[in-house]
């Protein structure tokens, strides 16, 4: 039975594509003074001037492919439901959600550019082949449910970078708009991610960087749409119908009048003729979590990185980045 699907359509789809500039630390490799060198590429702006001071920085263009798994709790409030053309009824006092858990497998393709020696800008496309939400209800009766859907979307962002005495830092912000199969309209997500790290080892052209950081996630609050009752519940069985009727029978007459259309449809032989309208608010249960990551610079063209998120929201990211100069230079 899928009663939880009436609610899970509003679960935040965190398409969590950590958009850290893959080579931000390279501009600020400590207090080592390198000799001035010739830089012909027109990008980044002011790149030639920076090169004249002996500061090394990455090739301006980059293409990256990332994969991420994320698991996090989500809070859902202000639940309203309606049947067909009936007015929406506030269910917040009747439906008590014990827990909502979101699991996401996501892929991200992005193109980035060092516009200035300290500023990276990028665009990205997101694909989530599997976003699973598990919901546990405690009232009006205990029930566990879950659903899986696909999500597509895209967005843009920017990363500011700085460094001092061998330590580098970045501050990244990005916005994505994601379209899920079971949600009306786009779900907007904003990620704010500061990081600080350093180069810990170098072997000729190969370098290893490690960092720590934090990520804040903000999602669009209100979610609404419609779903067929048959998709939400499946074919009602005797046990579920009994639970609904027992709950309905315990309501005072005024509240029974509000929910009578819904209960009548559940008790009918053809629940597929009814459509449930819904509206709810949602947010991530914890805005901030901690990040620990590392990047292996194979050469000036190829980079491999990995990052894990801990503390309530858990995540694992792996990525491959290829950098190149402006064509013709």
Tell me the role of every PLM-derived stretch.
Residues 75-82, 132-140, 180-187, 222-229, ...:
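Outer-membrane beta-barrel translocator domains and adjoining extracellular loop/strand segments
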Residues 59, 103-107, 148-156, 177, ...:
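Residues that define the transmembrane beta-barrel architecture of outer-membrane proteins
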Residues 50, 92-97, 138-146, 178-185, ...:
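Extracellular loop and loop/strand-boundary signature of outer-membrane beta-barrel proteins
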